Amino acid sequence: MPAGVGTKLFFSRNPNPRLAVAVARHLGARLTFEFASPFAPGQAERFRPLNPNLSLPILAWPGGSLWEADAIACRLSRDMGSDFWRGGEDEPDMIRWLSWGKENFARACDMVHFERGTKQRYGLGPIDHQLVEEGLKLFQATAAILETTLVGRQWLVGNSVSYADFRMATFLPFNDVAGLPLSDYPALARWYRRLEAVEAWRDPFKGLAAPHLPPVPRQEAMR
């Protein structure tokens, strides 16, 4: 599946689709972007053949498709001949961080963001404060590990930004509503500031037709 004519990345502004758009723009991938809402009335028929889960992101091309942000990042990096998805000796290290992050740091961020952000955006019920506390405890434990790792180094793998950094930070662009105490971890906070200096990460939707997410009522976000 060479990225090129007829290749589309279907996305929304939610965390994992945002991640995929940031990857594609960072790599300069040859594709077009299309905002999508597979769960909207009348849309399931169109998107189910591309992804039976109906979740975004979806990379589609004539005759095929690929879903899940990690798989899409791997595919696009290979297509563009980039080491953004690390290969060779660095690949196990990168996969280690992807695996650990998914089950630990990113999971902690997701737990808190879902309660304070996603549920409140879409009216899915009150904040479950027990789950928030569990998420914050996991955040503190895993942020401490990243803090130790990032002292004296700029990126998680090697000497340049990689997909491991993008993936680890999946939920941090939404920290205005999640309220995770990132500043308590100076090396981790510096790492994220470096990531925000990468234009594709900081503003992946620049120039794209992409409706904003519903706002989170401010009185609910931290209640």
Regions found by a protein language model. Name each.
Residues L208-R223:
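Acidic/histidine-enriched, glycine/proline-rich intrinsically disordered or flexible terminal extensions
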Residues G101-A197:
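GST-like fold's C-terminal all-alpha helical module
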Residues M1-H129, M222-R223:
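GST-like domain detector, emphasizing the conserved glutathione-binding G-site
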Residues A71, A187, A200:
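Residue-level recognition of oxygen-bearing side chains
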Residues L27, N51, M80, L150, ...:
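A broad structural signal for alpha-helix termini and local helix breaks/kinks
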Residues S37-A40, A164, A209-A210:
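Conserved beta-strand edge residues that scaffold enzyme active sites
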Residues P41, Y192, H212-L213:
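Generic structural signal for helix capping and beta-alpha/helix-loop junctions
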